[in-house]
Amino acid sequence: MNEADVTKFVNNARKTLTDAQLLCSSANLRIVDIKKKLSSWQLSISKLNFLIVGLRQQGKFLYTILKEGIGTKLIQKQWNQAVLVVLVDEMKYWQYEITSKVQRLDGIVNELSISEKDDTDPSKLGDYISRDNVNLLNDKLKEVPVIERQIENIKLQYENMVRKVNKELIDTKLTDVTQKFQSKFGIDNLMETNVAEQFSRELTDLEKDLAEIMNSLTQHFDKTLLLQDKKIDNDEREELFKVVQGDDKELYNIFKTLHEVIDDVDKTILNLGQFLQAKIKEKTELHSEVSEIINDFNRNLEYLLIFKDISNLIDSFKNSCTQDIQTTKELCEFYDNFEESYGNLVLEAKRRKDVANRMKTILKDCEKQLQNLDAQDQEERQNFIAENGTYLPETIWPGKIDDFSSLYTLNYNVKNP
């Protein structure tokens, strides 16, 4: 065993191992890079699938909102039924009520204003009421045709939107993009999936081959270093020399095999890269269609906001009508109370007239009694003077003895109520 040979073996093993490490490291970097691209592509496909599934659910949700939320609840129940039928009927009813009450008041003569000296037409109860809010509901009813046209226009837009969402968006675009995805990347295209998995398995196998070659070269290099150790006995060292010598002769073939494996790595990477490039192009094209669908959803969202704005306007009209109905109800109640109070006032006037008549009767009776008493008093005075006047001097009761003026003065006035 020649020490020079040992040194040569060590140098050959070191150089081969170093060169192999450089080649394998570079190859491994390329493998890692292409695997990252493969993983990134697979992740992007998963995201695209998630996006498409989400859009399909959003399409169903949008269609449900249109059919049930807008079509049934908003247009049919709230607008057509609650506003154009129930609300309009209620406004017509209360407008008729208040008009009838005003006409009734206009036909009732104010008995309290009738005078024998006044030959003009007597006033009516309608002359004493405010008419500012009598036609509130009539004014609102005049706005109803405008609201009807708005509802009809929005209904046409709604029907057009439902058709587009159902036929163009859901049945056509979403269905088409779903079928394309399943055809190109989904479970319907197992071949494409198998190709990607096959490339991945090939690269993994090639990585193992590279690892085995590197392991073999490392073991050989360790053996050459062991030959330099003088502590092992000669027999064992001689046996190790033969092994190392044989392995040294195989270094060329091993290195050649390494190059072949690396060539396979590069071919696989190239094929996988071309495969990914084609798939990425297909995904990009499909993603463009998905982006167009997203834009359609955004446009539909803007249309929904239009429905919201119209709904707010109609709600505002409805609330205003409700307030006017309440005002009209209160006015009708006031007119009823006014007529009832007028009836009570007529009774009160009659009562006062009766009281005045009673007062007149009492006063006339009192006047008659006073006149009778006064006549009796006059007679008594005359008798007194006849009997006693001759004997009584005037000065004893100055101005009183022969005074025949009445003892009472009666002035009264009973108002004509």
Curated annotation (Swiss-Prot):
Residues annotated as coiled-coil are 146-221, 353-384
Please give the annotated consequence of changing C24R: Decreases affinity for ATG13
Matching entries from Pfam families are given as: ATG17_like
Q: Name one GO cellular component term.
A: phagophore assembly site membrane
**GO biological-process terms attached to the record:** autophagosome assembly; autophagy; autophagy of mitochondrion; cellular response to nitrogen starvation; mitophagy; nucleophagy; pexophagy; piecemeal microautophagy of the nucleus
- Annotated InterPro entries: Atg17, ATG17-like_dom
Localization, per the record, is: Cytoplasm; Preautophagosomal structure membrane
Query: What's the chief localization of this chain?
Result: cytoplasm
Query: What is the annotated role of this protein in its UniProt record?
Result: Autophagy-specific protein that functions with ATG13, ATG29, and CIS1/ATG31 in response to autophagy-inducing signals as a scaffold to recruit other ATG proteins to organize pre-autophagosomal structure (PAS) formation. Modulates the timing and magnitude of the autophagy response, such as the size of the sequestering vesicles, through interacting with and regulating ATG1 kinase activity. Plays particularly a role in pexophagy and nucleophagy. With ATG13, is required for ATG1 activation by autophosphorylation of 'Thr-226'. Recruits ATG9 to the pre-autophagosomal structure.
Q: Which PANTHER family is this protein grouped with?
A: AUTOPHAGY-RELATED PROTEIN 17
Q: How is the subunit organization of this protein annotated in UniProt?
A: Forms a complex with ATG13, ATG29 and CIS1/ATG31. The ATG17-ATG29-ATG31 complex interacts with the ATG1-ATG13 complex. Forms a complex with SNX4 and ATG20. Interacts with ATG11 and the conserved oligomeric Golgi (COG) complex subunits COG1, COG3 and COG4. Interacts with ATG9 (via N-terminus); required for recruitment to the PAS during autophagy and starved conditions.
What family does this chain come from, according to its entry? Belongs to the ATG17 family.
**Which protein, by its recorded name, is this?**
Autophagy-related protein 17
- Organism, by scientific name, is Saccharomyces cerevisiae (strain ATCC 204508 / S288c) (Baker's yeast)
